[in-house]
């Protein structure tokens, strides 16, 4: 049980409407344990607090209002406002982030509304946001709606109409492969192949100033976005956010769909560029739609997402642990925020041009630290990682609003780019999952359908052979159909080695009668 101390709200700090300091963070007064380390705002065990936040966030998202044109608010705006529509359009990776998070969330909760929402978002982007098949950069998604309530995505927030971001296109392609595996709908596979083919057609070998694809490019003319500032011309020729694109290519190769030889060749070229440049220089480059081309920035999301990709692909290099550890070290050294050391936590700033600690960035860094611990056995930062996750709970209000510290309620950072980090942290360390519930935490396949009941957990997935990790804290496994099982009763962790697309786990109640479903 956690012994709690509460820092009073009125200790002379300069409180704004949502102050952020070591006494109060966004919505809540800071709580600490007996040793002075930050704990979740609710005062609960982290496993309880994380689960509560995840459920509240999903509930807020799915019940968000529609805009005047009948389109869900989260498909047209990057920032939530309760009484009026924000003047800004979609976040650059907003749909991709939500698709990635909801894929994990569906396995965790089994709520059929989750895949329905995923289908709605993917279909809307495919139908209202792709570049023309006859464009130079064809069949790629535009990341922004320049006419906010037009119902169409047609450009880039800073570069303007006609521009797109190839890294976000690669991410969408990877999510379309996942959605094809989930639903069996060939339109998603077709969309992924078209994105991959378009990217292959424009890849370059790259150098220290040019990535294999630019960050912003005009779909019709091929012009890389430019901006002049203080007499100097800047070009949007560089970013390092290519691990999702590598996932797109490998996903299509595994399915034997599209020009797999060209995908393999392009992936090898991109991998070589990453190893030669960003891994060697820590020049991670831009990611965010609202940062102008002239304001070059190195971002936590690009760096730590690459570290996660490397850890999940042991054949990437002989030195995966050292490379991933080096990236995590750079993120901490360059973007660690030391304003909260009184409560024994160092959250992570967003990027070099915006040195403000973020709910999404801090929780992502923490989840990758826990993955690093799981894969390498080096767990020196494990305690700090959990405190980072605890710190990021304070941005979530009881009703599921999730506000970026010192900023707005971003539908990127607070939703799609938040939930996934807690679910991945639970998968690496199941002790962070609820102690009285049953949940699927991880699969090497894609879940197509899952149902939880007191007597059994049954799920269907894309691949026959796969590995699943579950936390069974409400039940005890009796038997499994469709695979073999290994039960760790002390950790309440069940590992399934599946040999069938359909798996059913028969359950027994816990002897102590505790647990809920």
Regions found by a protein language model. Give the residues of each.
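Carbohydrate-binding/catalytic loop surfaces
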Residues: 70-90, 136-163, 209-243, 281-308, ...
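Boundary at the C-terminal end of the N-terminal hydrophobic targeting segment
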Residues: 8-12
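Low-complexity, Ser/Thr/Pro/Gly-enriched N-terminal "stalk/linker" regions
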Residues: 13-93, 112-159, 194, 198, ...
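Solenoidal tandem-repeat scaffolds enriched in leucines and small polar residues
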Residues: 170, 177, 185-279
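Solvent-exposed beta-hairpin/edge-strand motifs
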Residues: 471-484
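Terminal, non-catalytic domain-edge segments
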Residues: 13-69, 120, 176, 182, ...
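Non-membrane alpha-helical segments in proteins
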Residues: 87-108, 120-121, 174-178
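Bacterial N-terminal signal peptides
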Residues: 1-6
């Amino acid at each position: 049980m956690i012994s709690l101390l509460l820092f009073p709200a009125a200790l002379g700090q300069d409180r704004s409407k949502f102050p952020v300091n070591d006494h109060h963070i966004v919505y809540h007064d800071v709580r600490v344990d007996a040793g002075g380390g930050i704990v979740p705002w609710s005062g609960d065990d982290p496993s309880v607090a994380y689960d509560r936040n995840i459920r509240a966030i999903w509930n807020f998202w799915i019940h968000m209002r529609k805009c005047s044109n009948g389109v869900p608010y989260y498909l047209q705006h990057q920032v939530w406002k309760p009484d009026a529509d924000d003047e800004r359009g979609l976040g650059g990776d907003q749909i991709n982030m939500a698709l990635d998070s909801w894929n994990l969330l569906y396995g965790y909760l089994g709520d059929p509304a989750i895949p329905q929402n995923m289908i709605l978002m993917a279909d809307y982007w495919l139908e209202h946001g792709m570049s023309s098949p006859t464009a130079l950069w064809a069949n790629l998604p535009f990341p922004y709606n320049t006419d906010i309530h037009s119902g169409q995505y047609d450009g880039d927030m800073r570069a303007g109409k006609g521009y797109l971001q190839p890294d976000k296109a690669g991410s969408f392609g990877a999510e379309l492969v996942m959605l094809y595996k989930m639903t069996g709908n060939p339109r998603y596979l077709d969309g992924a192949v078209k994105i991959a083919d378009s990217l292959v057609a424009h890849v370059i070998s790259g150098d220290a100033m040019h990535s294999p694809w630019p960050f912003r490019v005009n779909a019709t003319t091929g012009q890389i976005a430019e901006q002049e500032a203080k007499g100097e011309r800047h070009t949007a020729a560089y970013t390092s956010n290519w691990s999702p694109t590598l996932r797109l290519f490998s996903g299509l190769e595994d399915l034997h769909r599209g020009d797999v030889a060209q995908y393999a060749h392009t992936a090898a070229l991109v991998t070589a560029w990453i190893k030669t440049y960003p891994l060697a220089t820590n020049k991670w480059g831009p990611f965010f739609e609202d940062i102008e081309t002239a304001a070059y920035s190195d971002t936590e999301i690009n760096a730590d997402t690459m570290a996660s990709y490397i850890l999940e692909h042991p054949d990437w290099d002989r030195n995966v642990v050292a490379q991933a550890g080096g990236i995590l070290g750079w993120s901490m050294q360059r973007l660690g925020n030391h304003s909260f050391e009184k409560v024994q936590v160092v959250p992570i700033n967003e990027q070099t041009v915006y040195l403000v600690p973020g709910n999404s960035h801090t929780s992502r860094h923490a989840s990758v630290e826990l993955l690093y611990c799981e894969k390498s056995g080096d767990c020196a930062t494990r305690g700090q990682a959990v405190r980072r996750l605890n710190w990021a709970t304070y941005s979530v209000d009881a009703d599921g609003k999730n506000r970026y510290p010192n900023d707005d309620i971003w539908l990127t950072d607070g939703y799609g780019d938040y939930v996934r980090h807690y679910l991945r942290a639970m998968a690496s360390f199941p002790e962070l999952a609820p102690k009285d519930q049953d949940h699927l935490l991880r699969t090497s396949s894609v879940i197509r359908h899952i149902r939880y009941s007191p007597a059994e957990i049954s799920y269907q997935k894309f691949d026959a052979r796969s590995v699943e990790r579950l936390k069974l804290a409400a039940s005890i496994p009796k038997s499994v159909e469709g695979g073999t099982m290994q039960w760790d009763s002390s950790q309440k962790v069940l590992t399934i080695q599946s040999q069938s697309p359909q798996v059913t786990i028969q359950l027994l109640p816990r002897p102590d009668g505790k647990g809920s479903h």
